[in-house]
A protein has these predicted regions:
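Non-catalytic substrate/cofactor recognition surfaces at enzyme active-site rims
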Residues: 1-423
């Protein structure tokens, strides 16, 4: 079914546990299975949840209408079919995400950009509808097969928050290395470069300048061993690894300076940040989430990992195996839902991160981000093997409240006086 392709094949092929794929096999470098949870009434399918990872980027960023994209069209099509089957107006179809981090709804391979550029305007909506219809048809077909598995048993769940900027990695997930840690969230140059098909970023000349400026700042900081911030910078670059850092979101710094130091012409993201900064809307508040909700839900012998980020195909598979290993005696299947409970950027494997494609540049907490998720989710999964009254996990950590005074100033397009658009 022509519905999904890996958009970051070089990064994918860096993983030591995958079969290498060619440019003609990008459709095979993804998780091609869809997980489905159906709800039946009097033997008839009433509602369902689909878990399948593919970006909702059939529509480009030049359109000016809100749209549910492929996932929204999939839900609408499926609900229409359910209505006809059940004669009930309360059917619900949810098309949730799974390992969508490196998965595109657009073809990736030879002449990929030319093929994408032929889909413009109204054709983009039609493409999204077709992609969604494919997903809906596959889901409905699978759910109407008689050998679906009945889920029985109790429901259990644990949710806790973790400061992803300060996770010490279990050596098991750090190739045996000790004392590896995550760091404050940082956006790399590839974040601004965008993706090759789904969303092109800043012009190449600007990206080149960003690379040079970031490298120069790193050299300057690490050369100044007498600086009061030397140890801090040393730890930051050790954690962030090969990433050429543009934004240190935790410190509100852009290339080592205040957030509004770079002219708005460089990039739309920087332009918007400049507007909000000058309006006083983001001077103290966190730029991105740092304390993240982690959750596992257990329904009978099925467990669902609720993951806040955009996790790649292999990163998701490894995380599922980490959790499944801890729950092996009490569950038959472990599934994953991404973009869940919060949003915190991407989660790439250590190997994928070294490629520094868009996904690696947007893996905020450094090269051990995925290992941090494995470390914390392993601890969380272990709690399910303990009676509820004896469980012990972090129930105290919570995100800081957003500063109300700054929140009141935020708009889609602020200015320094009124923080509202002036036409």
């Amino acid at each position: 079914t022509p519905v999904a392709w890996n958009r970051s094949l070089q990064a994918y092929n860096r993983n030591t546990d995958v079969e290498q794929k060619t440019e003609q096999q990008t459709h095979l470098a993804i998780q091609r299975e869809m997980q489905l949870l159906g709800f039946y009434r009097q033997g008839k399918l009433q509602s369902f949840i689909s878990f399948f990872g593919v970006h909702a980027t059939c529509l480009g960023n030049t359109l000016n209408a809100h749209d549910g994209d492929n996932k929204g069209y999939a839900a609408a099509f499926a609900e229409q079919q359910l209505l006809q089957l059940t004669q009930s107006d309360d059917a619900i179809a949810i098309f949730a995400q799974a390992t969508a981090g490196d998965v595109s709804p657009h073809f990736h391979g030879e002449n990929q950009l030319k093929i994408r550029q032929k889909i413009k305007g109204e054709q983009e909506y039609l493409y999204a509808q077709k992609n969604g219809q494919y997903q809906a048809e596959q889901a409905l077909q699978a759910l109407n097969i008689e050998n679906t598995q009945l889920i029985e048993g109790s429901i259990d769940a644990i949710l806790m928050y973790s400061d992803l900027a300060n996770v010490e990695i279990s050596p098991e997930f750090a190739f045996g290395q000790l004392r590896q840690k995550t760091s404050q969230p940082c956006h790399g140059v590839p974040f601004f470069a965008g993706t090759p098909v789904d969303g092109l970023g800043a012009p190449k000349a600007i990206i080149h300048i960003m690379h040079l400026a970031s490298k120069a700042l790193r050299i300057k900081r690490l050369k100044n061993t007498t600086s009061a911030e030397y140890e801090k910078h040393k730890a930051l670059y050790a954690s962030q690894g090969v990433k050429n850092i543009v934004i240190e979101a935790g410190d509100h710094r852009l290339l080592g300076k205040s957030l509004d130091v770079v002219p708005s012409i460089f990039d739309p993201v920087i332009a918007e940040m400049n507007r909000q900064y000058k309006a006083g809307a983001i001077k103290e508040s966190l730029l991105v989430p740092q304390v993240i909700p982690l959750q596992i839900i257990k329904i009978g012998r099925l467990s669902l990992i609720c993951c806040a980020g955009e996790i790649t195909t292999v990163a998701g598979a490894r995380l599922v195996q980490t959790v499944k290993h801890q729950l092996s005696t009490s569950v038959d299947q472990v599934w994953l839902a991404s973009y869940c409970n919060d949003y915190m950027g991407y989660i790439t494997t250590y190997e994928e991160y070294q490629q520094q494609a868009y996904e690696g540049g947007h893996t905020l907490y450094g090269q051990w981000t995925h290992a941090a998720f494995q470390t914390v989710y392993q601890q969380l999964a272990q709690q399910f093997n303990i009676p509820q009254e004896q469980r012990h996990y972090d129930a105290v950590t919570r995100p800081k409240d957003v500063i109300k005074a700054e929140l009141d100033l935020r708009t889609n397009r602020g200015n320094s006086k009124t923080a509202v658009t002036q036409n």
